[in-house]
Swiss-Prot record:
Protein name: O-methyltransferase 3
Assigned protein family: Belongs to the methyltransferase superfamily. METL family.
InterPro entries according to UniProt: Methyltransf_12 (IPR013217), METTL2/6/8-like (IPR026113), SAM-dependent_MTases_sf (IPR029063)
Annotated stretches, region: Disordered: 1-21, 408-437
Any Pfam family the entry gives: Methyltransf_12
Coiled-coil region(s): 146-180
Record-level Gene Ontology MF annotations: RNA methyltransferase activity; S-adenosylmethionine-dependent methyltransferase activity
Length: 437
């Protein structure tokens, strides 16, 4: 029978093993012979599982990307560089705040953003009153579609099953939901009143607020600055009923072409920074200037948290099948005129270390995504990083309070993995990580 792949192409005769339908690895679709390959030995049908991005699969992905030859012309490159803001502004005008789901999963990845110590199972309860339950915890990606709101019936059914599963997990542990919520109310009050834990957070590329508003609820003791180079996106943040200047300041800034205004954010004043699927939208040759600008605003001891697209992600392989989409090495043009870059951990670390940051964590997060209806297996690859501005040993009062507040989880967390990454990472070697998402 005819079947559609996730990319919309029609294929004939679903492969079978014996009398059973079998899973197909969608990456093989891009190979020269165009034949779909059966994924062997899939024991379960668990979607969004951590996987080992093994050398065989990486070799296939690398051989595919090396065959790319069509690069858009210089005139088109200049046009999309000069009009990058306009294309994103059009994107937000078209989609408003309805494209991306709230990212209610970042506290699970970065414990410094989880002062209430909310677990994965508790997350959907914490956010359920906001109609933003824990879908994000399963769908962990960001810009470009992995956490967008356009979902089919199968997606919604899966999410409902996940909610039921998590509720069952809590009940099996004899968790009293009412008592849990009362505890959060008490903890929030204590955090808000504790002057020693008041930190400042800056989000670079805030979009419509899909990151900042969940984090505001989770981090009542922190003050947030957020900016975007799309005026329409910033207006959407400000029009949100939760916008409160006592807790949040949103403004327009193009980090790729200008410094962060010191009239709003003073140098050496920020404790934490967030770049969630933002750096990839900037031209590679401007990333170093961006890192330098962020370094100036961050306090000594402050930390920059990054999540973005990794090399050989499923979406990169999709670009390869489309002519006229490659701008430069690992840099592509979307249909709507926006752009995206795919990182290695080595490149990510080099960018920020050159600006003076210390790499604390730089690793891959690889996931297998299975579509049961179409029986296809796809792979997402992200990079996740933590970069610290070195401490000021001469004047310790200038240093951020992050390390003391959180008992230095940044340096203790995944320190061995970070050392391994620094020693072993290159553009042709990726590693699987077990991360919350």
């Amino acid at each position: 029978m005819n079947n559609k792949t996730s990319n919309g192409d029609i294929t004939n005769d679903e492969p079978t093993v014996g009398s059973k339908r079998s899973w197909t690895d969608v990456n093989y679709k891009f190979c020269e012979d165009k034949e779909k390959q059966v994924v062997e030995e899939i024991q379960t049908e668990t979607s969004w599982a951590d996987v080992d991005w093994d050398s065989v699969r990486e070799s296939i992905a690398k051989s595919i990307t090396e065959k790319e030859t069509d690069i858009i012309g210089e005139e088109d490159k200049i046009h999309h560089e000069d009009n990058a803001m306009d294309y994103w502004d059009k994107f937000y005008k078209k989609n408003q705040n309805k494209f991306f789901k709230d990212r209610t999963y970042l506290h699970l990845e970065f414990p410094e953003l989880n002062p209430l110590k909310i677990t994965r199972d508790e997350t959907f309860i914490f956010f359920e009153d906001d109609d933003a339950a824990a879908e994000g915890a399963e769908n962990g990606g960001g810009g470009g579609g992995s956490d967008n709101l356009y979902q089919d019936k199968d997606d919604l059914e899966k999410q409902e099953k996940e909610r039921e599963k998590k509720m069952a997990n809590l009940l099996s542990k004899n968790v009293d939901i009412k008592e849990l919520k009362n505890r959060w109310v008490k903890d929030i009050q204590e955090l808000t009143n504790d002057e020693s834990k008041k930190l400042t957070v800056l989000e670079i590329g805030c979009g419509t607020g899909a990151t900042v508003y969940p984090l505001l609820k989770l981090n009542p003791e922190k003050y947030f600055y957020v900016f975007d180079f799309s005026p329409h996106a910033v207006n959407l943040v400000k029009s949100n009923s939760l916008y409160n200047e006592a807790k949040l300041n949103a403004f327009v800034c193009d980090i790729a072409t200008e410094q962060i205004p010191t009239s709003i954010v003073k140098d050496n004043s920020i404790d934490m920074m967030l770049m969630i699927f933002v750096l990839s939208a900037i031209s590679r040759d401007k990333m170093h200037a961006v890192a330098n600008s962020l370094f100036k605003s961050l306090k000594p001891g402050g930390v920059l948290y990054i999540r973005d697209y990794g090399l050989y992600d499923m979406t990169q392989l999709r670009f390869i099948s489309k002519k006229g989409k490659k701008i430069d090495e690992n840099f592509y043009l979307r249909a709507d005129g926006t752009r995206t870059y795919f990182f290695t951990t080595q490149v990510l670390s080099e960018i920020f270390e050159a600006a003076g940051f210390k790499t604390l964590v730089s690793k891959y997060d690889t996931r297998e995504l299975r579509n049961r209806k179409r029986m296809i297996s796809m792979y997402r690859v992200w990079v996740r990083g933590k970069f610290m501005k070195p401490l000021d040993n001469e004047n310790t009062e200038n240093n951020s309070k992050i390390l003391s507040i959180y008992n230095d989880p940044i340096n203790n967390n995944n320190n061995n993995n970070n050392n391994n990454n620094n020693n072993n990472n290159n553009t042709t070697t990726t590693t699987s990580t077990t991360t919350t998402n």
